[in-house]
Amino acid sequence: MSIITDIYAREVLDSRGNPTIEVEVYTESGAFGRGMVPSGASTGEYEAVELRDGDKARYLGKGVTKAVDNVNNIIAEAIIGYDVRDQMAIDKAMIDLDGTPNKGKLGANAILGVSIAVARAAADYLEVPLYHYLGGFNTKVLPTPMMNIINGGSHADNSIDFQEFMIMPVGAPTFKEALRMGAEVFHALASILKGRGLATSVGDEGGFAPNLGSNEEGFEVIIEAIEKAGYVPGKDVVLAMDAASSEFYDKEKGVYVLADSGEGEKTTEEMIAFYEELVSKYPIISIEDGLDENDWDGFKKLTEVLGDKVQLVGDDLFVTNTTKLAEGIEKGIANSILIKVNQIGTLTETFEAIEMAKEAGYTAVVSHRSGETEDSTISDIAVATNAGQIKTGSLSRTDRIAKYNQLLRIEDQLGDVAEYKGLKSFYNLKNK
């Protein structure tokens, strides 16, 4: 009864109006699962391949009919007949079927859509929530959210180089209260920006995209918003950032070009000094992709300087890849990994990366992409793995709110068992 009888994929749209893939899996018993695949704007050089059609006459070349056909004609033939509960075997079969190191033949988007849909169908078959199916009955930790309330870089058309300025409500007793605190700071920020005559339009991830005078002004205005909302910066709410430095690194010159803000060129050493200065002035607890994805020597220096007191997250640096992560762990680079399911392409490999990080004392931050859908699987993954942190955008746009609302449901379902760890989520820091 748990045997897969049908797999079907179709082309749908993501939050940016670009095509993405949706996959449905059916079993003999009538159990059903659906998975939708996100897409990034700033992508790491070593990410698994997102297969696009390249036909400029259709969706400007961004169609995914090739990926859809690969699911319907190749993957389906190989996977139909499997027990839907055998996630690892199904994921491995798809990896072997693709046969490339980066899933470039079938497309990571095709493979991931099936992987998610299979997990959801298995949970439906067993009549348990997805987070319980994926994590067993020790799933209890609600993640501390990184809420991206100011967007810059590749996520907005403004004068800010850094891609994300985030708040983390570490002083909240529950996820529900953390979400409320974040929403109140978000609305306070809207009021402040409006009062200054600045735009309150939002970027890809639902954060505001104002034309501020400098990158540092992003932190200043958020501190003001935290206080306006009635909270204490550094105690109730701390700051996090995603520099996405690979996006403004000039490979030919070997320097970081802060062109949007007009702050000029900086060497690796100057960037590290800049981060040191920011951390000394503002309650910044997490910096993601502070340096270019290939600047491993620089990352090692950054880790030596700030690694005891600041979470240094590798996104483009590690691309949710256990081989890259293992190398980083061995070399003492960063102390955290960003987990994006579509960077690697299967749930099995995603869980392996999270487990490897935890074993090494690195944190794992489960993350959305800038091009999202209403699929809320990452919320279940965050709880299933007790990861402790999630990054899923701002307090606007339904594609972001869908993840927060799912976490509210999960916390409600868990009842007294649910834990919200706040500052304790940063077990990788010696000096919090």
UniProtKB/Swiss-Prot annotation:
Pathway: Carbohydrate degradation; glycolysis; pyruvate from D-glyceraldehyde 3-phosphate: step 4/5. Keywords: Cytoplasm, Glycolysis, Lyase, Magnesium, Metal-binding, Secreted. It catalyses: (2R)-2-phosphoglycerate = phosphoenolpyruvate + H2O. Binds a second Mg(2+) ion via substrate during catalysis. It is found in: Cytoplasm; Secreted; Cell surface. Its EC number is 4.2.1.11. Gene3D superfamilies: Enolase-like C-terminal domain (3.20.20.120), Enolase-like, N-terminal domain (3.30.390.10). Its cofactor is Mg(2+). (2R)-2-phosphoglycerate binds at residues 163, 340, 369-370, 391. Mg(2+) binds at residues 242, 288, 315. It is an enzyme of class 4 (lyase). SUPFAM superfamilies: Enolase C-terminal domain-like (SSF51604), Enolase N-terminal domain-like (SSF54826). The active site is at residues 205, 340. One of its GO terms (molecular function) is magnesium ion binding. One of its GO terms (biological process) is glycolytic process. Covalent binding to the substrate (probably 2-PG) at Lys-340 of a small fraction of enolase causes inactivation of the enzyme, and possibly serves as a signal for the export of the protein. One of its GO terms (cellular component) is cell surface. InterPro entries: Enolase (IPR000941), Enolase-like_C_sf (IPR036849), Enolase-like_N (IPR029017), Enolase_C (IPR020810), Enolase_CS (IPR020809), Enolase_N (IPR020811). NCBIfam families: eno. Belongs to the enolase family. Catalyzes the reversible conversion of 2-phosphoglycerate (2-PG) into phosphoenolpyruvate (PEP). It is essential for the degradation of carbohydrates via glycolysis. PANTHER family: ENOLASE (PTHR11902:SF1). This is Enolase.
